[in-house]
Amino acid sequence: MSHPAPEAPAAESLDFIREIAQEDLRSGKHPVIVTRFPPEPNGYLHIGHAKSICLNFGLALEHPGSRCHLRFDDTNPAKEDIEYVESIQEDVHWLGFDWGTHLFHASDYFDQIHDFALELIAKGLSYVCDLPVEEVRATRGTLTEPGTNSPYRTRTPEENLDLFARMRAGEFPDGSRTLRAKIDMASPNMNLRDPVIYRIKKVPHDRTGDKWCIYPTYDMAHGYSDALEGITHSICTLEFEAHRPLYDWLIDHVSAPCHPRQIEFSRLNLTYTVMSKRKLLELVEKGLVDGWDDPRMPTISGLRRRGYTPSGIRSFCHHIGVTKYNSITDMGLLEAAVREDLNKTAPRFLGVLRPLKFTITNWPAGQIEPLEAAINPADPESGTRQIPFTGELLIEQDDFMEEPTPGYFRLAPGRTARLRHGYNVTCEDVIKDDTGRVIELRGPYDPESRHSKPKKGTAVIHWLSAAHAVPAEVRLYDRLLTVPDPNDIPDGTDWTSTLNPESLDILGQAHVEPAALTSPGTFQFERLGYFCQDSKHSQPGKPVLNRTVTLKDTWAKAQAKV
């Protein structure tokens, strides 16, 4: 399901990439902007990819006639899967963006990229190298020492063309030969030290079958795919800044139809989570999370399952902006953006997470009174709903304290509280079981209090009619990690030791307002936070609810006390 894309940012909020794009249009360098989002289909997209998606598709939306391509970088068939292709398309659509007819794959261009390789060989700008991968790596040198020329660097173009043809024909085993660009083994830029641009991989490809047993590297395929598609601005994260000279060199030395401009921006890093695809895969494979879409994961599918909204994520990506400086962003900013979005749109219901029975001693036997409450106070047009009120209620255990501490204003023996949308009740009796655990409160209600304002100091608490409440399992999620930055840990420490053992709290005795279970999307339980039904485990008659986000930033408050 797709969602409407956001409006273009206001002019005063232009980032440096948008300024470049606008200047290129003003100067006539380009009549339109053409960008691309080029994921590798070897994993699920995460919130960091959402930033790139919003930037690339956003640029196209902001300029009439412009477009953004979705291109799968499918140059490594051993690690790719159709599952990831489908999930990536679903995620991009869900975020509110559409590539229209501009869906491409790097494999669409394998023939043309191969022709470019032949062109480089014929010009004496690339050569077939017989060094094993480990030796290629060892002879690259260091940041302070030049690399060593391969003994195969002096092969003639004719010999290289013959060997490359035999590589394609499958004569040589995997890893035995590579095609390398002939640039400069003494370059201060390690990426220009005769990089590998083709390697032998006898692995069938999902789209091309057994046609190829040699595949271009990312650097080889990336720039040429951009050029063949007429991309104007090839936007990458900062780790590709050092690759830009190679990007330009490869395009400059063949008959490419155009030369896109590569621009780099800082990638998104969030506190208390991980963005590394390798680490996310480790969590999934070790069973440390409930799959790629675990609501604690930063994957888009995980955020969707948790109840985050596309507009909230887009708002967050716009708010953090686009810069050239790497930094780590507070997870609280993402939660705040989602919270702000949900406050405008989410319907309100009542739910009790840890129920405690309250019996109203003077309530007429069998009487059910419908009470009216707003569906969403932030949206007057949303209307109202009816909540049944009876003499046997469920309240939150936390809303009662037998021996109240200073500053506690909710129910206690002899104390009165206002029931939300309802009446004042007073606790007169406390019923306990044999272990001394409080199992029931009893007391009268004030029938005249329904339409009066609570007295100063009277707390307002939520409740449910015991006879009408529906049992549900509720899952409360918290930070995935206990440390802000999983990379900032002592050497030799297993990063998974920073996983938060309290990141999931499953409450099996919760009860909820029935209407909440028929509400699509994310909703608010008043006083508790925003919740949604779990798309993976919730079943008819056995609802499972996920807490999307609290009503306030309780994590920051808790950390301030540490």
Which residues make up each language-model segment?
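Active-site cores that bind ATP or allylic diphosphates and position pyrophosphate for catalysis
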Residues: 70, 74-76, 82, 119-279, ...
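Long, charged, mostly alpha-helical binding arms that flank functional sites
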Residues: 258-337
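A glycine-rich helix N-cap at a beta->alpha junction
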Residues: 84-110, 116-117, 124-127
